[in-house]
């Protein structure tokens, strides 16, 4: 007997019951993006490896440990995308979208990182990102954060996420801070774990978000990044905080917040939650004014964020399950025998024309009334339409509310209006 082939570890199938939840959440996210005037861009899953090395940084965990990289038949090094910003910038440069233009873009799709699979974190994961090009003021940073806050309200999870902000300044300011931080860490190497000792010289800012409690305690006495900020970055960050205060968006300034990718400057932010066990990041982003030029384009200010959809789905399921309690179908059409099947299918098509968006399923495969009503219940239908020979003859259909059990015969010509009333 042949051995079953299974999905690769950390790469999951999403079955019909799960995809219905995803579609509901994704639809909400896309509607909010549209209300802010953002446009979708669709990008390749595979890119040339140098794109990510140049954008993300050679000495980041993503590039050193986590990328799925391979050579194609021409000997070119290709990589399954580990994040979306680099590909979005590459596309903007390649197609002339960024030259003296303002762009507000979003994308959605699978990303790939070779990490240890755990709840909410997989080797193939799904990400929604938004990127804005051509605007350099703190007002657009604030708008992106306001947009995400509107998502949380729409999903009913506002009370379960909190915003952390920081400014990591300019490249020059970070270089000065990096020197001070390394000098401090060198004096306390006995407290550092092996990972922090390695990062101390390759990417010292990553030591700031070490999960080691001893290292975190040590960092209480470390130099603070905010003390090294340039004047422009201070002014930018103060402007952002003022706008968020005016919008009523609560936040915490976290001086240890740095992002895991090298291209960020000035604003960085994360929305975090404690509702999934240990604290986890739901959405994160920041400003990356140098990346377009770094990848071969003209100097272009830019800011964006990305959100892992697996973790968002888990959060909505945990704290607002009513949001996703949506039936697979609204209406189930029961037909009494093969002789009425044609009339049932004709009626179903007419109702789909008259009621766009309604989820209507027609019974197929026969079965008596008991079996058909059991199928209606299985699919979560609120209403059953019953069509027998007598109803076909006199142009009516029986409408049964499956919650209350009430039923009434309605003329087929007016059944759509009757159903709209029942469905609200």
UniProtKB/Swiss-Prot annotation:
Keywords: Aminoacyl-tRNA synthetase, ATP-binding, Cytoplasm, Ligase, Nucleotide-binding, Protein biosynthesis. One of its GO terms (cellular component) is cytoplasm. One of its GO terms (molecular function) is ATP binding. It catalyses: tRNA(His) + L-histidine + ATP = L-histidyl-tRNA(His) + AMP + diphosphate + H(+). SUPFAM superfamilies: Class II aaRS ABD-related (SSF52954), Class II aaRS and biotin synthetases (SSF55681). InterPro entries: aa-tRNA-synth_II (IPR006195), aa-tRNA-synth_II/BPL/LPL (IPR045864), Anticodon-bd (IPR004154), Anticodon-bd_dom_sf (IPR036621), His-tRNA-ligase (IPR015807), HisRS-like_core (IPR041715), HisRS/HisZ (IPR004516), HisRS_anticodon (IPR033656). PANTHER family: HISTIDINE--TRNA LIGASE, MITOCHONDRIAL-RELATED (PTHR43707:SF1), HISTIDYL-TRNA SYNTHETASE (PTHR43707). Belongs to the class-II aminoacyl-tRNA synthetase family. This is Histidine--tRNA ligase. The lineage of its organism: Bacteria, Pseudomonadati, Pseudomonadota, Gammaproteobacteria, Enterobacterales.
């Amino acid at each position: 007997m042949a051995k079953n082939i299974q999905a690769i570890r950390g790469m999951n199938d999403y079955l019909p019951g799960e995809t219905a939840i995803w579609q509901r959440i994704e639809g909400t996210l896309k509607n909010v993006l549209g209300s802010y005037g953002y446009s979708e861009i669709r990008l390749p899953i595979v890119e040339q490896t140098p794109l990510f090395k140049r954008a993300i940084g050679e000495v980041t965990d993503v590039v050193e440990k986590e990328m799925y990289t391979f050579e194609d038949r021409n000997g070119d090094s290709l990589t399954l995308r580990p994040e979306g910003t680099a590909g979005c910038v590459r596309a903007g440069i390649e197609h002339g979208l960024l030259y003296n233009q303002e762009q507000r873009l979003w994308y959605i799709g699978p990303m790939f990182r070779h990490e240890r699979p755990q709840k909410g974190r997989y080797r193939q994961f799904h990400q929604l990102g938004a990127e804005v090009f051509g605007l350099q003021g703190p007002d657009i940073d604030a708008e992106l954060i306001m947009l995400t806050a509107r998502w949380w309200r729409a999903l009913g999870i506002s009370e379960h996420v909190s915003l952390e902000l920081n400014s990591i300044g300019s490249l020059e300011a970070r270089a000065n801070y990096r020197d001070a931080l390394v000098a401090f860490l060198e004096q306390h190497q006995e407290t550092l774990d092996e990972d922090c000792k390695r990062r101390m010289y390759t990417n010292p800012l990553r030591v700031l978000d070490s999960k080691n409690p001893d290292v975190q305690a040590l960092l209480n006495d470390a130099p603070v990044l905010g003390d090294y900020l340039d004047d422009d970055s201070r002014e930018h960050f103060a402007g952002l905080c003022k706008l968020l205060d005016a919008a009523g968006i609560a936040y915490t300034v976290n001086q240890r917040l740095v992002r895991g990718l090298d291209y960020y400057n000035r604003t960085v932010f994360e929305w975090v939650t404690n509702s999934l066990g240990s604290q986890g990041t739901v959405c994160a982003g920041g400003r990356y004014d140098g990346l377009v030029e770094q990848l071969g384009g003209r100097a272009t200010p830019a800011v964006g964020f990305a959100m892992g959809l697996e973790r968002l789905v888990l959060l909505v399921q945990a704290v607002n399950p009513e949001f996703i309690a949506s039936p697979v179908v609204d209406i189930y059409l029961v037909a009494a025998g093969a002789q009425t099947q044609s009339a049932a299918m004709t009626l179903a098509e007419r109702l789909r024309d008259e009621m766009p968006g309604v989820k209507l399923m027609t019974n197929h495969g026969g079965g008596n009334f008991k079996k058909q009503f059991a199928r209606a219940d299985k699919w979560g239908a609120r209403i059953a339409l019953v069509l027998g020979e007598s109803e076909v003859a006199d142009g009516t259909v029986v409408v049964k509310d499956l919650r209350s059990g009430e039923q009434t015969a309605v003329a087929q010509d007016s059944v759509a209006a009757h159903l709209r009333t029942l469905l609200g």
